[in-house]
């Protein structure tokens, strides 16, 4: 949240265009040159301005959005992990599973199961 509020207050307009592209379609971002092009900047200048505006590199920001969306979908829907992997731009479901486990600490299926167990427990407390 702090990254989101800081970004909202101080983003260079060119970086804002790239951030919107990442948030709207993280699976469509296949390389950083694409984001630099959206921002209308050279790759080197884009990296410099992006990091100065957000505090992180474009790749780190993309990965943060991918984790955020993966967690949201894993806990709030029954979308298959293969479909989620495609939506987020991973070349294979195995790559997505490794990425998720490395960033979240559990496999997507284990995370979904535990989060749903928590939701059932919350319901029982009411």
Task: Describe each region flagged by the PLM.
Residues 1, 45, 94:
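N-terminal/domain-start segments enriched in small and hydrophobic, helix-friendly residues
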Residues 1-24, 34-37:
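An amphipathic alpha-helical interaction segment
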Residues 36, 45-48:
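Short acidic/polar alpha-helix capping motifs at helix-coil junctions
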Residues 20, 24, 29-34, 41, ...:
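Terminal helix-turn-helix DNA-binding modules in bacterial transcription factors
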């Amino acid at each position: 949240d702090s990254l989101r509020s800081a970004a909202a207050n101080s983003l260079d307009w060119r970086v804002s265009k790239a951030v919107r592209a990442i948030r709207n379609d993280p699976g469509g971002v296949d390389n950083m040159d694409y984001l630099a092009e959206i921002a209308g900047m050279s790759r080197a200048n884009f990296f410099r301005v992006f990091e100065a505006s957000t505090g992180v590199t474009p790749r780190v920001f993309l990965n943060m959005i991918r984790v955020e969306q993966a967690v949201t979908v894993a806990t709030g829907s029954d979308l298959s992990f293969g479909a989620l992997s495609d939506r987020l731009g991973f070349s294979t479901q195995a790559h997505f599973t490794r990425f998720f486990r490395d960033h979240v600490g559990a496999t997507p299926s284990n995370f979904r199961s535990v989060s749903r167990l928590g939701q059932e427990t919350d319901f029982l407390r009411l």
